[in-house]
Amino acid sequence: MEIYKEVGKPAEVVKRFQIAKMKGTHGIGHTRMATESAVTTLGAHPFSTGEDQCLVHNGSLSNHNSLRRELIRKEMTFETENDSEVAASFITYRMNSGRTLKEALESALVELDGFYTFVVGTENGFGVLRDPIACKPAVLAETPDYVAFGSEYRALTSLPKIEKAKVWEPEPATVYFWGH
């Protein structure tokens, strides 16, 4: 898994890292509107806190400080004050404890307070989870060739054959996973 993080407009970042030339089974990108931490490369998404795992997050966690302290006691480390890094570390800790990505995301529903949509990538695919009240917008598009996720439909409109895609809003408190 390769992680590319940068501050800037999406088109500039795509060009700088030559994203269009990359090959692989899946990719996760994120355009961030910072609400709780500085706009820096370190604070940019995705957050990777475990081997072959990364997370992007739209939302805000109200219990991230207490969860951070709990995870530090369990020997997890942090580089930022970002609540998204706490969410990524939470998922990593659960997966390192033997849980699957699905099980780790299901435990997030119980232990994380706030409103959120997570997209988590692993070497085997990616998962999506929305909080129990589906506070943050989310839309998925599926075709035989790809699965795409965005906060808004307009983020997906330039995808190939989007007009033939099954486009839908993921349910609250439901884990979705696509593998390869």
Language model segments and positions:
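Conserved short alpha-helical segments that host acidic/polar catalytic motifs at enzyme active sites
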Residues: 1-180
